[in-house]
Amino acid sequence: MINNAIAIIRDEHRSIASVLKGLLNHVAAVKAGKEEADLFLFKAMFDYIEAVPERIHHPKEDEYLFRFLRQRSSEAAAILDELEAQHVKGREDLAELRKILDDFDQSPNIHALDKALTAYAESQWDHMGKEDNVVIPLAEKYLTAEDWTAINTAFEVNRNHNAW
């Protein structure tokens, strides 16, 4: 069976990682005095992170992949608890980052932005690594064809980034 959901999850992870890397690269260039802070760019990239991971990607994982995996394997419970908690923490961290960025207009503090953004990016990269290297193999091991049909359907909805 072709598993489109896994390909989509990994593709979305690559996209999210690329945006985070772009943010960090711009912050590093600003800190080094090579570029001026581009608030439009920062805000557009933050909008992407709020739209894609927080409103599209994580809800699909929670509602479909994680839910079905919980039903099929107690082996996955601890990692799923951890990842779901990280989804909540990620939203909180992103709200804090947005506040730092909103304050940047009035009081530019590239060091505060760098510190918060670096911590956020590292936590997201670690999170995505656990999904790719722990959850997906468990899902491949335990989920049924019927589970994958439902998961694939859910992930295909946004395959062409229609909701972004």
Give a label for each model feature.
Residues 1-164:
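Small-residue-biased structural context
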